[in-house]
Amino acid sequence: MSLREEALHLHKVNQGKLESKSKVEVRNAKDLSLAYSPGVAEPCKDIHEDINKVYDYTMKGNMVAVVTDGTAVLGLGNIGPEAALPVMEGKAVLFKSFAGVDAFPIALNTNDVDKIVETVKLLEPTFGGVNLEDIAAPNCFIIEERLKKETNIPVFHDDQHGTAIVTVAGLVNALKLSGKSMSSIKVVANGAGAAGIAIIKLLHHYGVRDIVMCDSKGAIYEGRPNGMNDVKNEVAKFTNQDRKDGSLKDVIVDADVFIGVSVAGALTKEMVQSMAKDPIIFAMANPNPEIMPEDAREAGASVVGTGRSDFPNQVNNVLAFPGIFRGALDVRATHINEEMKIAAVEAIASLVSEDELSADYVIPAPFDKRVAPAVAKAVAKAAMETGVARITVDPEEVAEKTRKLTIIGE
């Protein structure tokens, strides 16, 4: 069978990828009296007296809503909520498989920002966290920022931050090979959508100061007269301080790092040759990268990462989001802040030892069982240190719990 035939068969024969499963058995009247009436009234009364006990007595503490409006699904674009549902189911499968997090798809039949925000807010009693997924820019930025302010559970747009965290982790290790520092490099990013914006924000937070971002109209700079929006205006305030104009070809000269989250073929061998010596290339357009790895290496690239599993250094969000939510849920975090994201970056990067580090191995493999426990531990610790954790736990216990819950490779 072809990939298409296999994929359709898997989804059809199982009627999707998720089901509801009870943690307790109801075999007799006693079981029924405990799981439902009259016994169920006891946790209800306790939660009514202390709302935080909802985490002790219900699924909330391990349940994430995977929310989409279907406007930016993979490489398929605006295909609507029903067509997005298989992706949301798949995301829930990854949450469970990689970190034991229960997740449920919520595909919303609206693109209205106010309606999406209000709907998610109304779901807060049920879910311990919210993963926003495949929502087009600029709505994705607005929705996330509003929900972070208007709810008290972690809200995380994975298309932005998951990609950013794994990319920066890869760059941390790639720079070890080059001997360069974050504060000294020039970075050119191509693609000003959700992932691109989040990557340069995290890089700036990490100490990178020489950043130029390009979109389809060329270099973004403060005061550019066309093709701007609120998010690009915000980015322009801390990037491209020399206000360079022109195309990607013009601004990439002497850059140390290229980060692409744009379209296939956007980066040419000639552009790579115009960069600084031994440039680092992260070409993450899917299904085909901005430049093929062999072409980038022929042009002088020292390290090349893509979004594909058939090339070395795959930038895969599954290295980030399961462990991030595991750590956040286990401390009952109210938010996922910058410190927690940076902790995730450091945890992922640290799993590649100095002995293992090479041009073809700067990012752990997606099925490396060490990743989710390490990320969960680091994120939980950072949450407690920055005051967004509701409870105190031993970070090592979080790691051990994650190891036991992870079912990949079994």
UniProtKB/Swiss-Prot annotation:
Assembly and interaction partners: Interacts with BrxC.
Keywords: Lyase, Magnesium, Manganese, Metal-binding, NADP, Oxidoreductase
Organism per entry: Bacillus subtilis (strain 168)
Designated gene of the protein: ytsJ
Gene3D superfamilies listed in its UniProt record: Malic enzyme, N-terminal domain, NAD(P)-binding Rossmann-like Domain
UniProt EC number: 1.1.1.40, 4.1.1.101
Main function: Bifunctional enzyme with both malic and malolactic enzyme activities. In the absence of NADPH, catalyzes the reversible decarboxylation of malate to pyruvate. Can use NAD and NADP, but with a very strong preference for NADP. In the presence of excess NADPH, catalyzes the non-oxidative decarboxylation of malate to lactate. During growth on glucose, contributes to NADPH balancing via oxidation of the NADPH produced in excess by other enzymatic reactions. Can also catalyze the decarboxylation of oxaloacetate.
Binding site for a divalent metal cation: 133-134, 159
Disruption phenotype: Mutant shows wild-type growth on glucose but a much slower growth rate on malate, fumarate, or succinate plus glutamate. Overexpression of the other three malic enzymes, mleA, maeA or malS cannot compensate for the ytsJ deletion. The ATP concentrations in the mutant grown in minimal medium with glucose are similar to the wild-type level. ATP concentrations decrease by about 20% in malate minimal medium. NADPH overproduction is virtually abolished in the deletion mutant.
InterPro entries linked: Aminoacid_DH-like_N_sf, Malate_Decarboxylase, Malic_enzyme_CS, Malic_N_dom, Malic_N_dom_sf, Malic_NAD-bd, Malic_NAD-bd_bact_type, Malic_OxRdtase
Co-factor remark: Divalent metal cations.
Leader sequence segment: none
UniProt activity-regulation remark: NADPH is a strong modulator that switches activity from a pyruvate-producing malic enzyme to a lactate-generating malolactic enzyme.
Active site: 36, 91
Keyword Magnesium appears in the UniProt entry: yes
Residues where NADP(+) binds: 192-195, 286, 317
Obligatory cofactor(s): Mg(2+); Mn(2+)
GO molecular function: malate dehydrogenase (decarboxylating) (NADP+) activity; malolactic enzyme activity; metal ion binding; NAD binding; oxaloacetate decarboxylase activity
Protein name per its UniProtKB record: Bifunctional malic/malolactic enzyme
Membrane listed as a keyword: no
Induction: Transcribed at a high level under all of the conditions tested.
Residue pairs linked by disulfide bridges in the UniProt entry: none
Catalysed conversion reaction: (S)-malate + NADP(+) = pyruvate + CO2 + NADPH; oxaloacetate + H(+) = pyruvate + CO2; (S)-malate + H(+) = (S)-lactate + CO2
Family annotation (Pfam families): malic, Malic_M
Entry's family note: Belongs to the malic enzymes family.
SMART domains in the record: malic, Malic_M
